[in-house]
């Protein structure tokens, strides 16, 4: 009996090419299995406590940026318009949650002592994960023993740094209270979930990569339900000071995405969690389908023009592969939630990549940027953009970007269908389902909703 190796070895070059095409087609079909979004939970700046209040903020074009609250740090003590001033920064703005101290530890069976040692990111994410499950119509305490995955983006560890100068405050709970792995694992532990639990740190794309990994886990039958998203809280001035010294932060306290005034971003914070399920299972179980993930992709720049600098060819590649994974044409996408940091370097590079892939077509395509509303949520930025995209698809309305007057002079949109929405507008009329995309440096996701939920 001939082995597979023998059969392939005996093939002609033409036969091997044909077999490769068949394998490639089969892998694309498997990778394009649609994943339903069945629940959403979020805590975001501007008093956002869920998808309804988030949509109100977006549709009304509200800015959630304020001066740094006194319970974080003394903004005036660290402020100096001179970027070179040691220990000072030319910004005192950000976008913050109203309350990060309130936590019902008893509800989750956590002692007050352990709760005090927990990074507020752990506390907030645990609450938002619970709320997302409730939004999905699921009883969180009834999921024990289920193959439910938890994939969350977590970035900085500023709470742990608070103990650096006061070792007397460190106890046994300080280790578990500050570990990224426990931020995710605690959700699985408290709910008794048996699927994979993974903490993801890919910097600003962390939460979008988490969604990508959760979709892959569902497609591979590694899990039957997944919680995906991320959290980021700005607790201390040191990180903000370092970013300011890089020249990344706007001295005006605004994010001018794609605008001629782009001079950096504003830091924001928050948490977002989506509940994901294979579409076939969601339909079978009668779940409310809020949106459908058709495909996604992740890559890395490799050795390029700088460790922290974006790379246009890599961006084009990841967007192209996400569309290929989704098996949908670029021209069918009418809304892209961009990375849109409002930096003189990043915006033109991102626009060039988007224009190369999405620029051609008849129907206009809007470039959204929620960072203009609430700053850069860093580890939670991707999920904030993802939830915005799902809500935009649901409501059939494209919300406005803020702080846009005139294109960055190094961007030329004239030969493309891309535009920046400056007021709320109806979704372009079409017989096709609504489709949107989310772009974050290093990852891209294609989301759909509407007729046929595709």
Where are these predicted regions, by residue range?
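N-terminal acidic, proline/glycine-rich, low-complexity intrinsically disordered segments
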Residues: 1-7
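Condensing-enzyme catalytic core of the thiolase-fold
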Residues: 10, 15, 21-454
């Amino acid at each position: 009996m001939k082995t597979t190796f023998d059969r392939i070895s005996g093939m002609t070059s033409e036969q091997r090419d044909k077999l490769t095409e068949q394998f490639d087609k089969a892998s694309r079909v498997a990778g394009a299995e649609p994943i339903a979004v069945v629940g959403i939970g979020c805590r975001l700046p501007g008093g956002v406590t869920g998808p309804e209040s988030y949509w109100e903020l977006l549709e009304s074009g509200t800015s959630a940026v304020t001066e740094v609250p006194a319970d974080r740090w003394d903004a005036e003590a660290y402020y100096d318009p001179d970027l070179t001033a040691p220990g000072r920064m030319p910004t005192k703005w950000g976008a913050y949650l109203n309350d990060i101290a309130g936590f019902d530890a008893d509800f989750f069976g956590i002692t007050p002592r352990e709760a005090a040692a927990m990074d507020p990111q752990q506390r907030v994410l645990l609450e938002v994960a619970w709320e997302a499950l409730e939004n999905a119509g699921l009883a969180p305490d009834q999921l024990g023993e289920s193959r439910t995955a938890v994939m969350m983006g977590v970035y900085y560890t500023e709470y742990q740094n608070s103990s650096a100068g006061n070792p007397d405050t460190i106890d046994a709970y300080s280790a578990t209270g500050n570990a990224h792995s426990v931020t995710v694992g605690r959700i699985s532990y408290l709910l008794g979930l048996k699927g994979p639990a993974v903490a993801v740190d890919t910097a600003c794309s962390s939460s979008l990569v988490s969604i990508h990994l959760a979709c892959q886990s569902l497609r591979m039958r590694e899990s039957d339900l997944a919680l995906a998203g991320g959290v980021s809280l700005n607790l201390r001035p040191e990180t903000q000071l370092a970013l300011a010294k890089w020249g990344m932060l706007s001295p005006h306290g605004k994010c001018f995405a794609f605008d001629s005034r782009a001079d950096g971003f504003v830091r924001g914070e928050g948490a977002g969690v989506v509940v994901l399920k294979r579409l076939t299972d969601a339909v079978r179980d009668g779940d409310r389908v809020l949106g459908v993930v058709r495909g996604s992709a992740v890559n890395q720049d490799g050795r390029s023009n700088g460790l922290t600098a974006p790379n246009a060819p890599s961006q084009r590649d990841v967007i192209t592969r996400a569309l290929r994974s989704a098996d949908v044409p670029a021209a069918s996408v009418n809304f892209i939630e961009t990375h849109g940091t409002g930096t003189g370097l990043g915006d033109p590079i991102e626009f060039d990549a988007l224009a190369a892939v999405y620029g051609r077509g008849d129907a206009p395509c809007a470039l959204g940027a929620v960072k203009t509303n609430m700053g850069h949520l860093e580890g939670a930025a991707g999920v904030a953009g993802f939830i915005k995209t799902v809500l935009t698809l649901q409501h059939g309305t494209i919300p406005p970007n803020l702080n846009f007057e005139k294109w960055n002079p190094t961007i030329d949109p004239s030969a493309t269908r891309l535009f920046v929405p400056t007021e709320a507008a109806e979704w372009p009329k079409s017989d096709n389902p609504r489709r949107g995309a989310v772009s974050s440096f290093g990852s891209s996701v294609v989301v759909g909703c509407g007729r046929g939920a595709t």
